[in-house]
């Protein structure tokens, strides 16, 4: 759509490409898409299928973009979706823990240190410790969204493109907050992946701790 808006491709080509991509998307959703594992990755599979559907006009999807900015854009979109889903799940988990804690303010149990009885403790107070852990996890994931919300599309292989593209338009269409600032940094940046992995690791340790303590209590 941006290429058409900028008069880089015509109306006919734009419609053919959009129709083809929607067809591919439906095939993937319905699990009817036939992946060719001899091709490099999902992008090449989609491109190959698009050529089958609309012919040589599929070649225009290469216009004003590179594999470099395409892969990073897809990765950020996936991580944004996953991060927002995790935040919702953390909110739901904390809500359920709070409800359970409210019912057990006066439930007294042994508190453990080094797997031995240490001090008496309210079950509610113990449960609220997990609420604090998951609140920190949520904050980490929300902080990650700041960098995931920068649109890489349009930086090309390294130094942009000679086509008169509109990165602000693709930013709005893809629901990013703003375009990235520097093309060289953009194509080499994977910090946001490490941020997501770190947040996920810490969160998984908290979940593992709950599971371990439930096993001990039983």
Which residues does each predicted region cover?
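A helix-coil-helix interface module used to build multimeric assemblies
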Residues: 1-160, 165-171, 178
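Generic detector of short, locally flexible boundary/turn motifs and exposed helical patches
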Residues: 99-100, 174-176, 189-190, 210
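Glycine-rich anion/phosphate-binding loop at the beta-strand->alpha-helix junction
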Residues: 137, 187-218
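A structural signal for small-residue-enriched, beta-sheet-centric alpha/beta enzyme cores
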Residues: 180-185
